[in-house]
Regions:
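Alpha-helical oligomerization segments
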Residues: 106-176
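A contiguous, surface-oriented mixed alpha/beta subdomain in the mid-to-C-terminal portion of proteins
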Residues: 1-136
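Non-Sec secretion/translocation targeting segments of pathogen effectors
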Residues: 170-192
Length: 192
């Protein structure tokens, strides 16, 4: 473990250590993105779905009953962090739009396009059930469900996303409600 004392002795800042860790993680543990079917079948072409043409991910997802995407690294060990490699969420968003993030384990993260319209409560229950039944305590991340908003580039808990959407919707309705209403003219103004 690297302590602040070691950083000071080595003359390395926390920011530099963080940046080096990000760069090295991507080199040593390259990103792997595949459909759930490909993952179950042993990771067929694990990087091709993401690295090649934009159509490849969409085409692969068309054949899926539930279009779940698995994000991990090539070793499939401690790969959940690969979702946080620079620009990964943004690139996924370009291909599939907004998406919900289901923390599967420390080894992978599941991504579900919002276009599927799965009820949030159902997803939360599913994550909690799978974690409780199939994921070892040491590999468990959380029972929370997260969301990535491609337009605003916001990663947040799904409950916060829903609240933010509701707030934005209410603001939009309030703004729409005042459109077209003319301000009363001053008493000294005349109209013909």
């Amino acid at each position: 473990m690297i302590t602040n004392s070691w950083l000071e002795i080595l003359g390395v800042t926390q920011e530099q250590l963080h940046q080096d860790a990000l760069n090295n993680s991507q080199k040593l543990f390259p990103l792997s993105v595949m459909t759930i079917t490909q993952a179950v079948m042993g990771g067929i072409d694990p990087t091709g779905v993401f690295a090649s043409s934009q159509e490849s991910l969409e085409e692969a997802l068309k054949d899926e009953e539930i279009p779940l995407i698995v994000v991990t690294n090539k070793t499939k060990t401690d790969g959940a962090a690969a979702l946080f490699y620079p620009e990964v969420m943004e690139q996924l968003g370009e291909k599939i739009g907004d998406f919900t993030i289901l923390p599967s384990s420390t080894h992978e993260t599941l991504i579900l396009p919002d276009s599927e319209g799965m009820p949030i409560q159902h997803l939360k229950e599913m994550v909690a059930e799978v974690n409780g039944s199939f994921v070892e305590d040491a590999d468990r991340l959380t029972d929370e469900v997260y969301h990535f908003d491609t337009k605003d580039r916001v990663f947040e808990k799904v409950d916060k996303f829903v609240a933010r959407q509701k707030e934005n919707s209410q603001k939009h309705v309030a703004e729409k409600g005042t459109e077209g209403i003319q301000k009363p003219k001053k008493s000294h103004e005349m109209s013909l």
